Regions:
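PLP-dependent amino-acid enzyme catalytic core
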Residues: 1-221
């Protein structure tokens, strides 16, 4: 329905850039997209890149949107290769061979390509909680913390002539402590998540050995 009137805007919460690159791939295949908004939490390497051409590794900060708590976006190299460098493999390899010990800064002309398709935002925990509470109070819809990060950009930029699609990425029931703090009751928990937080966590250490790792996976599958 939206596409019948104009190109789409997408706001996507991200850590490792997989969902953003999927959206970009859809654009390459013909989906009518105006802007892809890259939404991150306090771990802002992607926001720093799109905002100021600074792709440098920094310490990870723990947030209430843990899947986005990263220092390096593992899928970002794909966009640099395909979109920014026009599939120049040697140039891309040169940039990332020195990363993360050395940050990445593109030349101004190359970096400015992002203005054609991308923008970004960074949202801290306090703002994330405010968004969750606001949407719940006014629309009776419960956002998970990751989706709430993306909702911020949509709330700021959307208008009657500028519609946004916000990508939802997780079920709220995975984050009970967040809603307890906001005094919001989780009325429904999917069967698959029932008892999840009571299960024993297990940690196994392995050497960098293919046979050892695959043998363990096979025996526990």
């Amino acid at each position: 329905q939206l596409a019948a009137h104009q190109n789409l805007n997408f706001s996507i919460p991200t850590g490792n850039f997989g969902n953003v690159f999927a959206c970009y791939s859809a654009f390459k295949m013909g989906l009518p997209i105006n802007i892809i908004s890259v939404a991150v939490n306090d771990n802002d390497i992607l926001h720093r890149f799109f905002g100021s051409n600074d792709y440098s590794k920094k310490q990870v900060h723990e947030t209430i949107s843990p899947s986005m708590d990263i220092s390096v976006a593992s899928n970002f190299e794909r966009l640099v290769y395909d979109f920014f460098l026009d599939r120049n493999a040697s140039q891309c390899a040169e940039l990332f061979n020195n990363f993360p010990s050395q940050g990445i800064e593109l030349d101004e002309t190359t970096w400015s390509k992002k203005n054609k398709l991308f923008n970004s935002s960074s949202v801290n925990d306090a703002a994330t909680q405010e968004i969750i509470q606001s949407i719940f109070q006014h629309h009776h819809y419960l956002l998970d913390p990751h989706t709430a990060v993306a909702m911020q950009e949509a709330m700021v930029s959307a208008s009657d002539k500028n519609h946004f699609v916000v990508l939802a990425t997780a079920h709220p029931a995975k984050f009970p402590d967040v809603y307890k703090k906001l005094d919001i009751d989780l009325t429904e928990t999917p069967t698959a998540l029932t008892g999840l937080f009571k299960k024993t966590e297990q940690l196994h250490h392995f050497d960098s050995n293919y046979d050892q790792i695959t043998s363990f996976i096979s025996s526990h599958n």
